[in-house]
Amino acid sequence: MAAVALLRGAAVGRRSPAWHWRLSGTASHCLARGFGLLGSNPADGVAWTCFRLDGRALVRVRGPDAAPFLLGLSTNELPLSGPPTGAAQPSARAAYAHFLNVQGRTLYDVILYGLPECTEGAPSFLLECDSSVLGALQKHLSMYKIRRKVTVEPSPELHVWAVLPCVPQTSETAPLEERVEGTTMLIRDPRTARMGWRLLTQDDGPALVPRGQLGDLQDYHKYRYQQGIPEGVCDLPPGMALPLESNLVFMNGVSFTKGCYIGQELTARTHHTGVIRKRLFPVKLEGPLPASGVSPGAIVTVTATGQAAGKFRAGQGHVGLALLRSETIKGPLHIKTSESQLVAVTAVVPDWWPTAAK
């Protein structure tokens, strides 16, 4: 039944803008589940681990036409921009989305941030992207700018941090509150509560987070893979990955009620047919690995039949992501490495995915 349910695109609603500023006990517990690799002894006083993501970069898009311009290119609604109002919570200032090519395949995965600054009524947004495609994303945006009153420019002065809890929160844990002030933004990750918070700042991340410590970037990527979160061009190869196979719906990254955008036709048609035969699954690798790791694109094989189940996409150590046919995920799988070694593969369905996908 689980495999059958995974064939259908489970709909996930966008989060309500009426999120609470302070983490609730339930959300805190959800954030910390599965964080064994980030665990810290509570006695040492550390509550949060901060990871500086030098592999992520920021592009600023501003101007009177910034909002309609971005709406016509991205898969999702835009986050709020402009000065805070009593009706809007800072949580609504971040949104996850993909930019697609005309064939409907993913070019860039981005987190959009609506900035509080607003000059003469002109909104301003920051787009977080893989740093290796910073120039390509700017070129992509400029290509569609035409005569719109929009300025596209990098923001190298700001750094992106991921902030994750070390252990489940208790009444003694220092809670985080969302901040949108000056050059600092501390916002809940819009993809899933499991990914904690995003921090944009010119300053040192741990210094801004109560009881924060600097984390090892490899731990961040291992945890991200365990949760099934693709991020960047290694996980989402430009022009190859399909947004719904990449679980864009599960990560709150697409709106099926917004206006038209580049690449919409294939995404909308797939959604309305309700059948997604392949998905990007988190996988565990068992057995000795080659010194260079498993190669991206390595064929994942159904052990019992020898048929191809899909392809390994990317990973860190013994965890990673693989694009697999949903009906094959329960059976024993393996990868034959370039050194002719067999590596056992176990596909995992994350427990934060919608019930219909389990």
Curated annotation (Swiss-Prot):
GO terms for biological process: heme biosynthetic process. Mitochondrial protein involved in the maturation of mitochondrial [4Fe-4S]-proteins in the late stage of the iron-sulfur cluster assembly pathway. Operates in cooperation with ISCA2 in the maturation of [4Fe-4S] proteins. The modification N6-acetyllysine is found at residues 222, 311. SUPFAM superfamilies: Folate-binding domain. Keywords: Acetylation, Heme biosynthesis, Mitochondrion, Transit peptide. This is Iron-sulfur cluster assembly factor IBA57, mitochondrial. InterPro entries: TrmE/GcvT_dom1 (IPR027266), YgfZ/GcvT (IPR045179), YgfZ/GcvT_CS (IPR017703). Belongs to the GcvT family. CAF17/IBA57 subfamily. One of its GO terms (molecular function) is transferase activity. It is found in: Mitochondrion. The modification N6-succinyllysine is found at residue 311. The gene is Iba57. It comes from the Eukaryota.
